[in-house]
Amino acid sequence: MPVSDFQPVIGLEVHAQLLTQSKIFCGCSTAFGAEPNRNTCPVCLGMPGVLPVLNQRVAEFAVRTGLALECTIRPTSVWSRKNYFYPDLPKGYQITQFDQPICEHGRLVIDTPQGEKAIRILRIHMEEDAGKSVHDAGGGQSLVDLNRAGVPLLEIVSQPDLRDADEAVEYLKAMRDVLVYLGVNDGNLEEGSFRCDANVSVMPKGSTTFGQRCELKNLNSFRFLKQAIEYEIARQVDVIESGGKVVQETRLWDVNKGVTRSMRSKEEAHDYRYFPEPDLPPLHVSAEAIAAAAKALPELPRAKLQRFTSQYGLPAYDARILTAERPLADYFEACAGHYKDYKKLSNWFLGELMRLLKEEGTPLSALRFTPAQLGELLGAVDQGMVSANAGKDVLGEMFRTGKAPADIIAEKGLAQVSDTGAIEAVVDDILAKNAGEIEKYRAGKKQVFGFFVGQVMRAMKGKGNPALVNELLKKKLGD
């Protein structure tokens, strides 16, 4: 049976570091990039005799995320110890949640070629992150950095509702957008603050019995997620077709070789010997707290995208880019209050503004001009006060200096000539000097029209209103 005769079954476990200033059970900083083992204390180092204290902000972020993903929030959730030995886990156990997580039974809607699809979310639970092992230290050594130990995490576990690698990528992108909009995570896959594991299995099409699943790790980009899942699907089908059985295991995506490699046998829950965390009381979340969190939720990416297409009449492509990041969407809406041709505004955003931000490496928050000034510039272009090309130059100067568009236009002499009489005088002069070209044009060589436009614009040093130049030339040439 070829791969096409099998149905992939995929679920994702998303691990999102929370944007708190301190760790989940102590006051150590969560800042990324500090000197190894600098952001540590007896609590996150697992020293004897210390007691954890829950960072309230972590619970607030968990409730906010659960509500955004349409989960049921448990009034009471319980902490557990997950026991395993690894060099970067100093206590020998991880404080997490097991059978009573804070959030359950949610969903996230994604777009597929067949339309919208709701991916069910099994659970969301809070836990502490482990440290980080560094295996390329040289000299055959592995080093341990415990700065990350105790950093607060949300683990968001989907049901196995994804059916191919593209759906998995779409789900992960949608999840990242939601978490970033909520302000609970920065969405950075490269630094590992937003990462995922994929559980992949295959079954013959038409079957209702899932195959044996393998967990894939080291998926630190959307591209690697897609490549790893596609490889693993083909690998499992090949194993089955060869008469073998897929072994439940954890496999590592090898970026250099483009394959998954066996890492270890896949553990079951009983392997971790979960038991209640004796040093932390159950977490109680009141109905009033849940209601307040629900009321404070921002407009989420999918709802904002739909509103941008309906309220502003934007194509789905434009709306998707503009709403991908909340600051960009907010800035567009601020500009829309000063300039009402929303499609043209979108074109300037997706073209010149995005180009300038990328080339200069400037965050949107550092823009030196106001939404009102951008609206003023686009209005000047519409009214013929400055050409579209000159308008781009003005925007670049606004970007670099923060000066008002009117001042830049005046200083650089970019004002466009829209005086009909002045343009007509230049047109008459050009036509009088090019009688031969006029004959060619009237004989059917219409491409000569571009020659006349160029001559007029050159004579006016590029400041002639193009629409008026074209109109007057056509009138004079008898069109």
Curated annotation (Swiss-Prot):
One term of GO molecular function: asparaginyl-tRNA synthase (glutamine-hydrolyzing) activity
Is Metal-binding found in the keyword set? Answer: no
Keywords, sorted A to Z = ATP-binding, Ligase, Nucleotide-binding, Protein biosynthesis
Q: Where is the signal peptide?
A: none
Gene Ontology biological process terms from the UniProt entry: glutaminyl-tRNAGln biosynthesis via transamidation; translation
Provide the E.C. number(s) assigned to this enzyme: 6.3.5.-
Q: Name one Pfam family in it.
A: GatB_N
Is Acetylation tagged as a keyword? no
Q: Provide the reaction this enzyme catalyses.
A: L-glutamyl-tRNA(Gln) + L-glutamine + ATP + H2O = L-glutaminyl-tRNA(Gln) + L-glutamate + ADP + phosphate + H(+); L-aspartyl-tRNA(Asn) + L-glutamine + ATP + H2O = L-asparaginyl-tRNA(Asn) + L-glutamate + ADP + phosphate + 2 H(+)
Q: Which family does it belong to?
A: Belongs to the GatB/GatE family. GatB subfamily.
* Role of this protein: Allows the formation of correctly charged Asn-tRNA(Asn) or Gln-tRNA(Gln) through the transamidation of misacylated Asp-tRNA(Asn) or Glu-tRNA(Gln) in organisms which lack either or both of asparaginyl-tRNA or glutaminyl-tRNA synthetases. The reaction takes place in the presence of glutamine and ATP through an activated phospho-Asp-tRNA(Asn) or phospho-Glu-tRNA(Gln).
Protein name per UniProt: Aspartyl/glutamyl-tRNA(Asn/Gln) amidotransferase subunit B
